Regions:
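C-terminal ends and interior cores of transmembrane alpha-helices
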Residues: 86-99, 275-287
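Paired small-residue
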Residues: 102-110, 290-298
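Helix-loop boundary and gating motifs at the non-cytosolic
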Residues: 12-46, 50, 219-229
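Residue-level signature of mid-helix packing/kink "hotspots" within the transmembrane helices
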Residues: 58-66, 150-151, 249-254, 339
Length: 349
């Protein structure tokens, strides 16, 4: 992979960017295994409340996404990236004192704000570090931190819940982003365009954002309700379905990450949509968690192609000083997908 052969300090900065992102998404991934037992156990809530925690997270991320994009263009990706870790850690800390649904909603909102800042700034940073003909691959490789965290987080949290207790899993929500924040000290960052950056959002990013909304719905269905669904269907194993999805996306980013640059963003996006529909259909009818893992693997591979392909559509026609705003609009589609899917899937469950 050409990106791995970039000269220092860009190569070092790219590796550190991925490792820092892993810490943030490890915490976010862990929360998906923690919320269902917390809501239905200690808080005495329902599946609908679980669904609304996803929606609150998504709405907070959506609203914060636009401010994060403008902040990246005007104040720099480094600052916005660091702020994201701070919000994730603060939201995780509230899990320890969540005695009712309202406090949990606030915690999830803070995590959503943190995700918006961290994810948008991280993508902008990755694109800056990569050569133009490898931007799709750079987005894919940055996605390694996302999907490694989302695959390892639920499994790690579930193991801690099963063998130690819910309180032990909640520590992941705080410690992981704090360590990530410390790890990014001194990293090479992109320049700040405070004078040339505007206050509007590029139109070129709106259509790719709508396509990404579909991916958000699929992901919300898997990571938000796999635990509850397979507790009912098969007596457990939902966390492993989430893990299979994240692991497949992780591997797909490595093996397939070059395809958007080689095949083109449009052709790659169409293929990804087709396979995503096949995968989610398998999960929908699977009677056992291990069969659902097959569908999750297909969905994960499709997502590993869909996200960078659509991202390339969003940034290729956008000037460098507006790239943060463009990626903010684009990734907002992901939040919209989560916001729509949360209450819908909660009522279906």
């Amino acid at each position: 992979m050409e990106l791995l052969h970039l000269r220092s300090p860009r190569r070092i900065a790219f590796a550190r960017l991925i490792l820092a992102g892993l810490g943030g998404f490890l915490a976010l991934g862990a929360s998906y295994a923690i919320v269902p037992p917390l809501v239905k156990g200690e808080l005495g809530g329902t599946d609908v409340i679980v669904g609304w925690t996803i929606t609150v997270f998504a709405i907070a991320a959506l609203l914060a996404r636009f401010g994060a994009g403008l902040g990246i263009d005007r104040r720099g990706a480094r600052l916005v990236y660091a702020v994201g870790f701070g919000f994730i850690a603060l939201g995780g800390a509230l899990f320890f004192v969540a005695q009712n649904d309202s406090v949990l909603f606030v915690a999830r909102a803070l995590q959503g704000i943190g995700q918006a800042c961290m994810f948008t700034a991280g993508l902008t940073w990755a694109v800056y570090l990569a050569p133009k003909h490898r931007r799709g691959q750079a987005i894919s490789l940055f996605g390694l931190s996302v999907w490694a965290g989302l695959s390892l987080g639920p499994v790690a949290a579930q193991l801690l819940i099963d063998h130690v207790g819910l309180w032990a899993a909640e520590w992941l929500l705080v410690l992981a982003p704090i360590l990530a924040l410390v790890s990014m000290i001194g990293m090479l960052g992109p320049p700040v365009h405070s004078e040339s950056a505007g206050m509007s959002f590029p139109r070129e990013a709106f259509r790719p954002g709508l396509g990404l909304m579909f991916g958000g719905v699929v992901m919300a269905a898997i990571v938000g309700f796999a635990v509850l669904t397979f507790d009912f269907r098969d007596g457990g194993g939902g966390a492993y379905v989430i893990g299979a999805y994240g692991a497949a996306t992780f591997v797909g980013r490595i093996v397939l990450g070059h395809l958007p640059d080689r095949l083109g963003s449009y052709r790659t996006g169409v293929l990804a949509f087709i396979f995503a529909l096949i995968g989610i259909s398998i999960i929908g009818v699977a009677p056992t968690w291990w069969l659902a893992c097959v569908g999750a693997v297909i969905c994960g591979a499709a997502w590993s192609l869909l996200f960078p392909a659509l991202a390339l559509m969003a940034i290729d026609r956008t000037p460098a000083h507006r790239r943060g705003a463009a990626l903010a609009v684009y990734t907002a589609g992901f939040d919209l997908g989560f916001a729509v899917a949360g209450p819908l899937m909660g009522n279906v469950a």
